[in-house]
Amino acid sequence: WADASIAVQPCVLAMDSGGAGITSQGNASVNLTGCSMRSNAAISTGGSGTMSAAGFYAGSSITGSETGGPLFPYDGTISDPYAHYSPVQDALSQLGSSSGPAFNDKPGVTTPLVSGIPKFWSKWDIQGSVVLSPGIYYVNGDISLGDSASLSSLSSAGVTIVMGGVLTMRGGSIISLSAATKAVYLNGAIPGVVFAGNSSNRSSFNGNTGTKLTGVVYYPNGALDFGGTSQGGTTGCLEVIARSIQL
């Protein structure tokens, strides 16, 4: 986490003070161990979903009865913890500097991709299985995963995907990726950050329950739908930062 001054670090942070904040609908089950949930706007739960965390902090109201943990409504706002973190901002600033080719594959085919070859992609349309080597990947446009598609990395390989479009997952698609660590980061991967995007549109991490992400998912301008597997912890955790978040 780039801002160590926050006492109980958020695993889920919605930054827009005038928007939807954090919402939970349907049967979503969110268990944040050792970290908090924070919205600069409201936090609301509905349906049969449950949420538990070390604390719930909101710039306005907290509504719904299915929250397990201390509630802190009208607790003010916090700033973007990565707004001045140069590794992330420098990477985002490179998007659009070169268009690059599009990636398309076929169901049932496994394709390895190597960081920097090419440096920029225009989009990824994944129908089969894509396996990433360690490093950073720039995708100027959208990333889409079709039914039963998968996006993963080599064992112990830390990756960062920097993208300018939206991410969508269909059906039984799976993403299994981990960010690099400060001890081991190769080929430009940003330690701790697995996804960074600058789109103002809505991305959806709503694939198969096998989806597992370790690191920060950073979409400061866009809305994120994070289904089924939303989880976090103190070690090897998932941290989600976006304009607004639906669980």
Annotate each language-model stretch with its function.
Residues 98-102:
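Intrinsically disordered, low-complexity effector regions of RNA-metabolism proteins
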Residues 1-6, 28, 63-97:
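Short, structured interface segments
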Residues 2-48, 103-247:
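Long, polar low-complexity repeats
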Residues 41, 60-62:
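Short, polar loop motifs at secondary-structure junctions
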